[in-house]
Each structure stands twice: as structure tokens, then as C-alpha cells.
Amino acid sequence: MIQRKQTLFLLLAVIVCALGLFFPIGSIAPEGMGTDSMVYNLGVVTGEGGLAISATCIPLFVLLSVTAILSLVTIFLYKNRKVQMSICKCTMLLQVLWVIDYVLILLGIIPIPEVQGKMGIEFAACLPIVSPILVAMAYKGVNDDEKLVKAADRIR
């Protein structure tokens, strides 16, 4: 299981998603005077130090959590490559939905009502963007394994 390259890619995807859950994905500079508020996948930490769980951010948290869990589950389905490939496709779709939701929040189309101001990007917002690349590489590895098994079956 661990010697397969797609296992390493999926494990890296899990780690990247988990890190993305715990680090800020954006900062909001207030319109007036004050300190910046940090936006996490679950909510907003205001400049005064208060935590506000935002309904706007909950879909980000759910999508990234499900993505991490699906990537972890996919690692242990190494005996069933077809299911592994379909879960990889679903995982990539969820990650694309996360990126779309984040961009809508970043552009202000979906506002965060807890704080007002201009939102900026933080480093952790790049982590869920790297994750679909890792899952796509894992998908390619699983697909190559499937082709190899089919070729071996034809030889017999």
C-alpha cells in the first residue's frame, strides 16, 4: 500500500487539506481604523480577538473536511482501483467547488456579515488549490495500475 506512488500523493493531499483547515485563508482589512480580521474555513477571528463562526464560511469547512476524509479513505481502498478512481474524481470535484466558493467570498459576491472591509488572500488559501493537483496525480497512478493489471490479464 505505502509503496504505491498514488498513496503518497493522497497522503500529501490529506496533509495539505488538514493544514488548510487550521490556517487563515484570508484577512479582512477594516474600512475604518482597527486591526485586521482573519478568515478561517470555519469562521472569522475579529481584530479584537473574538471568534465568530460564520455561515458564509461553513461550506468552505465542510468541503475541505470531506475532501480530506475522502482522500484518506481512498488510500485504504487500494484493492479496489475502480472505486479509488471514482472517489478521486469526486474529491477533485469537491476541491473545485471549494475554490469557486472561496473566489465568490474573496470577490465579495458572498459577503461575510460579521466584518466589513476588503478581503485579502493568505498563504493557506493556496493549499486547497494544490490538493486537486495531488489527487489528479494519484488518479493517474491508479489508472496506470489498472491498465497494467488489464495488460497482465490479456497476456494470461
Where are these regions (language model features)?
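Membrane-interface helix-boundary signature
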Residues: 2-9, 53-60, 81-88, 113, ...
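N-terminal signal-anchor transmembrane alpha helix
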Residues: 4-27
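Cytoplasmic juxtamembrane regions at transmembrane-helix boundaries
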Residues: 11, 72-95, 154-156
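Membrane-helix exit/juxtamembrane interface segments
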Residues: 19-44
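Interfacial helix-start motif at the membrane-water boundary
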Residues: 42-65
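Membrane-helix exit/interface motif
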Residues: 70-77, 104-108
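Alpha-helical transmembrane segments of multi-pass integral membrane proteins
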Residues: 99-156
